[in-house]
């Protein structure tokens, strides 16, 4: 068919618009052009008679604009600008912004109104989120969809109210808004970015994609691995959209090197040559949309907007529309007009499951016409795909030369009888085909007499036939001939198994092992979207173990990659669908026989089918004739097969700063710190750690009893404030933090914690745990999470979120003796009304060699070392270290009432006082400590058990303590 071309019918120029997007309303009356400063509303009935403007204040261009497609909301349109979508209302010649939708964090790439629900709008963005908005409640999106990559296109399905599609670079995801957690299907559509996406107006499963890779592809998302058809082009395709009539498609190309900027009209059933060319634009066509058909007219109008700042309208007459129709539908109108004159069909030719025609009224006549038209359309589409149109055609195409098989076919009753005779076994089976076959409807199989196989063999055979038929009908393919071949192959395998057993009289009967079929079995192919969250299997890897071992595995010598080593390994199993669909060089799948049903076999063989499996990604077929002849002459069952690579466990304890032997030799004698330091120094000398010998020698000197602090702060400065006190210890901890020696860190912290307890220093966690947590946040050892996995046998309650090892300078950050900051002074004044109490508390902190501000970090050292000891099996040593882990109170969360202890009058939280350990309050009626549910008056502070208070105030109005407070009235807000 020769390509036709035409010029436009209406041309309107807008030189000052500088518009980047255009949209036509559902009534066909107005078009909106989106510029940076103004939105131009054009009356399409009189485009040359001036236009209206809506001013906008934004430095961002409009990326997408679209009118609401419903007549009742025809005056609404949405426009996206950077991260925001503005909803405009155009009514009676005036336009204004109604509201804005704000939720995306990156630029919005596309938007689309729902065809079924006028209030729903979907937006896509580079921030990887797709939001569905309800314009009646614009505070937040009603549905949120999340993908790995940013979305460039989003379109609602035109036949399914819950379905929508998004494009992400070269991929397409199909979503169901009722299941927002994951996509329904995944299409590896193109190798380059997708510029256009459009659903078929009549088929809910079909869509078209246009891409930078110079092609338009047609998809049925129920068959995601192979496109239905492809339109190859010489240049990238900017847009491709279906026409509202017949089976047309309009494409806009991205011009290269000053080529013509024309639109092309195609017939989707004949993509060899465009049926029409729209010539006229001088620059890139940015947008095109269809205008609603006028009443009483069969013509359509195509409205286009180009970068040359011209709006053009093209008339599509009935002659052009017929060019997009199928050849088989030429003259269908005449056939439909005379269809009522057709004679009544012979009842003997009707299938049994057809419904009789009870009347010849107008409704039945219309239904018959519609069925006739649908049959023509379906028949034409089926011919295009090269598939059988009817069950009778499938029967005629079956290869009746299959050995040992006799098939009696009955197309009228939609059934066939299969007879197979192999060896001593005979199988006769009735196959019934449903009306929907093969459209995702599998046939049924039933054994009939005479059938000689056992009941267990019948069950196995039925399972094989059902699996084979389901696999085919899911792709809308015929399954009769594949089922027949499976039936014959299975019977032959049973006969061969029996012959091999009878030929060896000394063979023992095997009642446990089920004989495997001898027919070729193809390993599973992967690549569906359900596999997108499954990582691609590793063939090599390494992992450090917390017990001082490195575990690694390698690829066996027989395994080679079938693609170039420079090609990246797929990140997930779903990526293999690209290989399957032919987008990337396909790989041969190996055929597995019963002798080598393994994932990684040492002797792959050839197959005629090109599918993708995990193993085929790594196998490379060898073409050496010498190797091939040697392989054919060797029995696969007798040749040793290396199923996988080696797993190697390497001892790397010599590379680590921690030593298992030191963990066994170290001691923690809380009654004699000097002896502990001395023996630990000897243990370090035994393993060759001379640096630790010096460390433990310094620790022994620092913990000498003669350096113990005095109880009176006025007598002398504590040794901890000496340069060789806390400052020296902090420098040691900082040094071994840089070396990641958690063993030394934990042991030093435990020893000096034990020394502080012997000196009678209080726990760093006092009655105000908030203070300790605030100080700990300024520790010089900022925490990081350890990546080592914990043993499943360890106590989860003692696990740590990580211990901190950082490269920090060792300047002194502890508070000098008898010095405090203004904040600390104000805080201490709130805590201690008497300055002597404050000075005493400060002295208790200054006596400690370990800075109380870092107590939480020191606990992390001990917990981490405790996990290492657990992995070494030194559980008693672990218990000794964990004894020195402090037990701070739970951090305060939320809002609760403060309580003064009834005994010591100090502030307390909870039912027990942290100072005097007594119960904080008593019931005003029973004078027993309150531990459970309680009620108190916010005015007088009195109260007690809830049950007692309720019983009291049923008859009384004043407080039970006699304070005179009317608690019920005072507590009413």
Curated annotation (Swiss-Prot):
Zinc finger annotations (C4-type) as residue ranges: 900-920
Protein name: GATOR2 complex protein WDR59
Biased composition (Polar residues): 351-360
Gene Ontology CC entries for this record: GATOR2 complex; lysosomal membrane; Seh1-associated complex; vacuolar membrane
Residues given in the record as Zn(2+) 1 binding sites: 901, 904, 913, 916
Residues bound to Zn(2+) 2: 926, 945, 948
Residue positions binding Zn(2+) 3: 937, 965, 967
Domain RWD: 393-494
Pfam families attached to this UniProt entry: WD40, zf-RING_16
Regulation: The GATOR2 complex is negatively regulated by the upstream amino acid sensors CASTOR1 and SESN2, which sequester the GATOR2 complex in absence of amino acids. In the presence of abundant amino acids, GATOR2 is released from CASTOR1 and SESN2 and activated.
């Amino acid at each position: 068919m020769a390509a036709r071309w035409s010029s436009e019918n209406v041309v309107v120029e807008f030189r000052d618009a500088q518009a980047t997007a255009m949209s036509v309303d559902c009534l066909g009356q107005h078009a909106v052009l989106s510029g940076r400063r103004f939105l131009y509303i054009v009356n399409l009935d009189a485009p040359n008679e001036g236009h209206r403007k809506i001013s906008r204040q934004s430095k961002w261009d409009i990326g997408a604009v679209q009118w609401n497609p419903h007549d009742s909301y025809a005056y609404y349109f949405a426009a996206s600008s950077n991260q925001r979508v503005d909803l405009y209302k155009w009514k009676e010649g005036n336009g204004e912004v109604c509201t804005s939708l704000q939720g995306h964090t990156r630029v919005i790439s596309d938007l689309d109104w729902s065809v079924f629900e006028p209030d729903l709008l979907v937006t896509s963005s580079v921030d990887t989120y797709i939001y569905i908005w309800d314009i009646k409640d614009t505070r937040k999106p009603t549905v949120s969809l999340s993908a790995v990559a940013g979305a460039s296109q989003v379109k609602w399905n035109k036949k399914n109210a819950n379905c929508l599609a998004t494009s992400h670079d070269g991929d397409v995801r199909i979503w169901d808004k009722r299941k927002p957690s994951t996509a329904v299907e995944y299409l590896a559509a193109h190798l380059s970015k997708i510029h256009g996406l459009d659903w078929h107006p009549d088929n809910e499963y079909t869509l078209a994609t246009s891409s930078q890779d110079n092609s338009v592809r047609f998809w049925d998302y129920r068959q995601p691995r192979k496109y239905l058809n492809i339109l190859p082009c010489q240049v990238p395709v900017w847009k491709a959209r279906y026409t509202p009539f017949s089976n047309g498609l309009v494409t806009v190309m991205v011009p290269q090197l000053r080529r013509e900027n024309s639109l092309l009209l195609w017939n989707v059933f004949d993509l060899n040559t465009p049926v029409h060319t729209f010539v006229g634009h001088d620059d890139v066509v940015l947008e095109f949309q269809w205008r609603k058909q006028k009443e009483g007219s069969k013509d359509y109008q195509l409205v286009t907007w180009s970068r040359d700042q011209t709006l053009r309208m093209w008339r599509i007459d009935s002659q052009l529309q017929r060019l997009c129709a199928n050849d088989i539908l030429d003259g269908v109108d005449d056939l439909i007009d005379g269809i009522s004159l057709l004679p009544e069909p012979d009842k003997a030719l009707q299938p049994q499951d057809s419904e009789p025609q009870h009347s010849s009224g107008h409704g039945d006549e219309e239904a018959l016409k519609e069925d006739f038209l649908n049959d023509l359309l379906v028949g034409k589409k089926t011919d295009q795909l090269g598939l059988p149109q009817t069950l009778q055609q499938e029967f005629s195409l079956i290869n009746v030369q299959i050995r040992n098989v006799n098939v009696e076919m009955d197309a009228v009753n939609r059934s066939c009888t299969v007879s197979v005779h192999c060896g001593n076994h005979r199988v006769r089976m009735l196959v019934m085909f449903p009306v929907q076959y093969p459209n995702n409807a599998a046939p049924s199989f039933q054994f009939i007499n005479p059938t000689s196989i056992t009941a267990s063999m019948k069950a196995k055979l039925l399972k094989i036939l059902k699996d084979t038929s389901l696999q085919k009908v899911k792709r809308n393919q015929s399954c009769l001939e594949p089922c027949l071949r499976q039936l014959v192959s299975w019977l032959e395998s049973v006969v061969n198994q029996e012959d091999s057993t009878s030929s060896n009289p000394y063979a023992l009967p095997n009642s446990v092992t089920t004989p495997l079929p001898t027919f070729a079995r193809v390993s599973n192919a992967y690549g569906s979207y359900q596999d997108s969250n499954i990582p691609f299997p590793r063939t090599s890897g390494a992992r450090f173990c917390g017990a001082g071992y490195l575990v690694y595995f390698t690829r066996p010598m027989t395994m080679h990659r079938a693609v170039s080593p420079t090609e990246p390994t797929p990140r997930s199993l779903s990526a293999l669908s690209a290989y399957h669909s032919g987008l990337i060089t396909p790989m041969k799948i190996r055929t597995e026989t019963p002798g080598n049903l393994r994932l990684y076999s040492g002797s792959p063989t050839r197959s005629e089918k090109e599918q993708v499996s995990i193993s085929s990604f790594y196998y490379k077929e060898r073409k050496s004739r010498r190797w091939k002849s040697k392989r054919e002459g060797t029995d696969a069952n007798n040749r040793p097969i290396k199923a996988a690579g080696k797993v190697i466990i390497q001892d790397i304890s010599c590379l680590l700063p921690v030593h298992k032997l030191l963990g066994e030799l170290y001691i923690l004698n809380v009654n004699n710190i000097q002896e502990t330091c001395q023996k630990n120094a000897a243990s370090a000398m035994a393993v060759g750690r001379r640096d630790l010998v010096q460390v433990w020698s310094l620790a022994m000197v620092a913990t000498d009893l003669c350096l113990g602090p005095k109880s009176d702060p006025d007598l002398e400065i504590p040794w901890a404030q000496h340069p060789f006190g806390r400052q020296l210890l902090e420098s040691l901890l900082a040094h071994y933090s840089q070396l990641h020696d958690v063993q030394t860190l934990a042991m030093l912290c435990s020893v000096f914690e034990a020394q502080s307890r012997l000196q009678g220093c209080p726990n760093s966690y006092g009655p105000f745990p908030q203070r300790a947590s605030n100080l700990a946040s300024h520790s010089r050892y900022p925490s990081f999470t350890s990546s080592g996995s914990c043993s499943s046998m360890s106590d989860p309650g003692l696990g740590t979120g990580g211990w901190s090892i950082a490269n920090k300078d060792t300047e002194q950050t502890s508070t000098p003796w008898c010095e405090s900051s203004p904040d600390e002074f104000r805080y201490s004044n709130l805590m201690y009304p008497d300055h002597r109490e404050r000075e005493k508390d400060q002295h208790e902190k200054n006596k400690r060699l370990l800075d109380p501000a870092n107590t939480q970090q020191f606990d992390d050292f001990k917990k981490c070392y405790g996990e290492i000891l657990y992995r070494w099996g030194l559980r008693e040593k672990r218990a000794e270290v964990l004894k020195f882990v402090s037990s701070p109170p739970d951090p305060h969360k939320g809002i609760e009432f403060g309580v003064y202890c009834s005994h010591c009058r100090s502030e307390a939280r909870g039912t027990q006082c942290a100072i005097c350990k007594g119960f904080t309050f008593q019931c005003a009626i029973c004078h027993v400590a309150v531990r459970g549910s309680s009620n108190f008056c916010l005015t007088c502070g009195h109260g007690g058990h809830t049950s007692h208070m309720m019983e009291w105030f049923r008859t009384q109005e004043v407080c039970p303590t006699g304070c005179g407070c009317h608690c019920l009235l005072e507590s009413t807000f």
